[in-house]
Amino acid sequence: MASQSQGIQQLLQAEKRAAEKVSEARKRKNRRLKQAKEEAQAEIEQYRLQREKEFKAKEAAALGSHGSCSSEVEKETREKMTVLQNYFEQNRDEVLDNLLAFVCDIRPEIHENYRING
């Protein structure tokens, strides 16, 4: 019976050692997974920063050419506004005189389609 008890004790100890080994293996696996996840996150962040840098460079190149177009359009607009302002200054008095003449100089006339009954 003592040998049976000793055999059971050996089995229990072996089971305990096996459980410890399984526990250690799980811990190692979790550490490896955590490390792999951190490395993947770092790689993703590095890739994202690289792509963002490339995007900003392309955006700056596109907006740089757009900025020169914008300044050209603004310059042309100022020139046209200057020309229109000059036309306004030249023709203001004449247009005002014509407008006042149409409003104030009324000549009553009978319409050509009006018939006098008689």
Curated annotation (Swiss-Prot):
<dbReference type="GO" id="GO:0005829">
    <property type="term" value="C:cytosol"/>
</dbReference>
<keyword id="KW-0813">Transport</keyword>
<dbReference type="GO" id="GO:0016471">
    <property type="term" value="C:vacuolar proton-transporting V-type ATPase complex"/>
</dbReference>
<dbReference type="InterPro" id="IPR005124">
    <property type="entry name" value="V-ATPase_G"/>
</dbReference>
<dbReference type="GO" id="GO:0005765">
    <property type="term" value="C:lysosomal membrane"/>
</dbReference>
<keyword id="KW-1003">Cell membrane</keyword>
<keyword id="KW-0472">Membrane</keyword>
<dbReference type="GO" id="GO:0016324">
    <property type="term" value="C:apical plasma membrane"/>
</dbReference>
<keyword id="KW-0406">Ion transport</keyword>
<dbReference type="GO" id="GO:0097401">
    <property type="term" value="P:synaptic vesicle lumen acidification"/>
</dbReference>
<feature type="modified residue" description="N-acetylalanine">
    <location>
        <position position="2"/>
    </location>
</feature>
<dbReference type="GO" id="GO:0098793">
    <property type="term" value="C:presynapse"/>
</dbReference>
<protein>
    <recommendedName>
        <fullName>V-type proton ATPase subunit G 1</fullName>
    </recommendedName>
</protein>
<keyword id="KW-0007">Acetylation</keyword>
<dbReference type="GO" id="GO:0000221">
    <property type="term" value="C:vacuolar proton-transporting V-type ATPase, V1 domain"/>
</dbReference>
<dbReference type="Pfam" id="PF03179">
    <property type="entry name" value="V-ATPase_G"/>
</dbReference>
<dbReference type="GO" id="GO:0033176">
    <property type="term" value="C:proton-transporting V-type ATPase complex"/>
</dbReference>
<comment type="similarity">
    <text>Belongs to the V-ATPase G subunit family.</text>
</comment>
<dbReference type="GO" id="GO:0036295">
    <property type="term" value="P:cellular response to increased oxygen levels"/>
</dbReference>
<dbReference type="GO" id="GO:0006879">
    <property type="term" value="P:intracellular iron ion homeostasis"/>
</dbReference>
<keyword id="KW-0375">Hydrogen ion transport</keyword>
<dbReference type="GO" id="GO:0005886">
    <property type="term" value="C:plasma membrane"/>
</dbReference>
<dbReference type="GO" id="GO:1904949">
    <property type="term" value="C:ATPase complex"/>
</dbReference>
<comment type="subunit">
    <text>V-ATPase is a heteromultimeric enzyme made up of two complexes: the ATP-hydrolytic V1 complex and the proton translocation V0 complex. The V1 complex consists of three catalytic AB heterodimers that form a heterohexamer, three peripheral stalks each consisting of EG heterodimers, one central rotor including subunits D and F, and the regulatory subunits C and H. The proton translocation complex V0 consists of the proton transport subunit a, a ring of proteolipid subunits c9c'', rotary subunit d, subunits e and f, and the accessory subunits ATP6AP1/Ac45 and ATP6AP2/PRR.</text>
</comment>
<comment type="function">
    <text>Subunit of the V1 complex of vacuolar(H+)-ATPase (V-ATPase), a multisubunit enzyme composed of a peripheral complex (V1) that hydrolyzes ATP and a membrane integral complex (V0) that translocates protons. V-ATPase is responsible for acidifying and maintaining the pH of intracellular compartments and in some cell types, is targeted to the plasma membrane, where it is responsible for acidifying the extracellular environment.</text>
</comment>
<dbReference type="GO" id="GO:0033180">
    <property type="term" value="C:proton-transporting V-type ATPase, V1 domain"/>
</dbReference>
<dbReference type="GO" id="GO:0046961">
    <property type="term" value="F:proton-transporting ATPase activity, rotational mechanism"/>
</dbReference>
<dbReference type="GO" id="GO:0016887">
    <property type="term" value="F:ATP hydrolysis activity"/>
</dbReference>
<dbReference type="GO" id="GO:0051117">
    <property type="term" value="F:ATPase binding"/>
</dbReference>
